[in-house]
């Protein structure tokens, strides 16, 4: 279920978007139990950002979400790797990238609901994805 929305002020070619998706998937490996093939990514390019009192020319914002909570060092490694991927593909310096990380305890998908803190006795194994 890992989801990332990457909003970029720069425009990317389709090949660059694919490369960014692949590199973000590799960054996701820092989150225990997550693999690149699990990543859902929405890559928006050509966006206009205003921050620090002015329009930003090369800026990015990342909204990352995944199921469960992980230790600080894993989150930090993930964030640094994601920002490095953006810098490599889009040329946006990590100092011009802002990122939110949401750790979700409830997630629905593939026709089911998963909750980190609740197991319905009638749900089979109740395992989250």
Residue map of PLM features:
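Interaction-mediating elements
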Residues: 1-129
């Amino acid at each position: 279920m890992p989801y990332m929305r990457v909003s970029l002020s720069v425009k990317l070619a389709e090949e660059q978007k694919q490369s960014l998706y692949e590199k973000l998937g590799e960054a996701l490996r820092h989150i225990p139990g997550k693999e690149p093939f699990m990543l859902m990514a929405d890559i928006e390019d050509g966006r206009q950002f205003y921050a620090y009192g002015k329009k930003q020319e090369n800026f990015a914002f990342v909204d990352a979400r995944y199921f469960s909570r992980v230790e600080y060092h894993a989150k930090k490694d993930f964030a640094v790797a994601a920002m490095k991927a953006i810098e490599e593909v889009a040329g946006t310096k990590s100092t011009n990238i802002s990122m939110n990380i949401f750790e979700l305890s409830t997630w629905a998908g593939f026709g089911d609901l998963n909750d980190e803190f609740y197991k319905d006795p009638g749900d089979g194994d109740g395992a989250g994805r």
